Amino acid sequence: MSSVDIKLINHACFMIDDGKEAIIFDPWFKGKVFNDSWSLLQETENIDLSKLKYIAITHEHPDHLHWPTLKYIKQNTNQIINVIVPYRKNKNVVNNIKKLGFKCAEILPNKEFKINHFLSIANYPTGHDTAYVFKIHDKIYLNQNDCILSHDQCLLIKNQYPKIDY
């Protein structure tokens, strides 16, 4: 079993890297959002994107789905990158991600989706927000970010993943 690093980039953005492949969640590297009312404590510079194969977006708020950062990633990488988004009936986000030149996969709610040899994720939506449970080898992580889960959703997650490690 290979070693996997989880690194906080900033805000809700973090990277999971096994040394060969990386996935980044909710990338927002620089700039302001919400009519210039929010900014990062420190803008992110010099991120190694060479192993980036996947981007996962939790929801459509600009501090999680930051279009300028997606454009930056596309302009500064040569590899094929798959963007993973929660399933939505409205396909605007999927269509715009594809227009940027990314591949895009929608994952169905409450079902585990195998990303690669070391990672699988499941999404648990609440309205426009989503929590992700991800499994790295034999460890279970919950990324709730700003998603408020109902009691029933917590029970569903607990039933599917009896032991959350982190």
Model regions and ranges:
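A short helix->loop->beta-strand "cap" motif at the edges of active sites that frequently abuts
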Residues: 21, 76-82, 102
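Active-site environment of divalent metal-dependent phosphoester hydrolases
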Residues: 31-32, 60-65, 90-93, 111-114, ...
